[in-house]
Amino acid sequence: MNILSALLADSDAELERDIPGCRTRRIAPGVWECLPERSTGSPLVLCAGVHGDETGPVEVLAELIDAACAGELMPRRPWLFAFGNLAALRLARRYLERDLNRCFRQPPHASGAEIEVARAHALAQALAIFARHGKGLLLDLHSTIRASRHPSFAIRPAPVPTAEGTPGLLASCGVPVLVEAGAEAPTFSALGAREHGFEAYTFELGRVRPLGAGPSEELDALRNGLWRLIEAATPSAGAGLPRVYRVQREIVKRSNAFVLHVAADAPNFLPLQAGQLLAEDSPQRWFAEEGECVLFPNPDVAPGTRAVVLVRPVEGGA
């Protein structure tokens, strides 16, 4: 049985066999660390499935783990691999009670949304254990739930110095666009940057697909890029610097009276007109500023949650 099938049947599943040439141990349900006997690279964290309906990256990660167990992929760096929200993944739902990727600043015993808060705490503990091997690279792999003018892009939660070389890293994984955000976000990648000094990214790759449909061809570059990262190989030559955007502000829904004047199905990176009314939450109103583009518009979030992100292109590259 492959690792994904095993986890869907039982959260406490173990790897069917050890990864050759490595010491492997499970440090939380759906989370393993793999320590090669011969390590030539810095630590690497790969996480997928923080949202249970984003299955393409989950299947890519599962394929890589199965290839490592079969001796086809040879890890050459300390490697943590994690499947995020197993309960939601089984039900093909984004989350059960609360968006897991908004829970990584919650105290471990926060009230409400027990499933996601508890899972965030388990993932944070696993990351802290693995971080003892030193600083490295963290990639949290997602799919988009909407159309996008840039089908694949990365979000860097803090403009930290790069260890792997951002242009080569992004290009080798088929990601031509970088969004620079703040490290205070409650996301898994921001946790890695903020608490452990990882060079951390959230990858948004392709569109949501049903589990079992298999990764789409648009994820081939991701699969190949991750394979090279795990083997500590030099990233393949890229096509120059990524296009860079920077987060300018976020609009938070404060009450159920909130109205978003951007269509809920508006594509990511849709340019806005300066002065355009964006949202209302009486008595407050928000208007677009020069050069801003929309990212992740969602009026249906719970009060107190971000409803839209506004970004602006940056001249030059990373």
Question: How should these model regions be labeled?
Answer:
Residues 1-318:
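Structured catalytic-domain cores with a bias toward divalent-metal coordination
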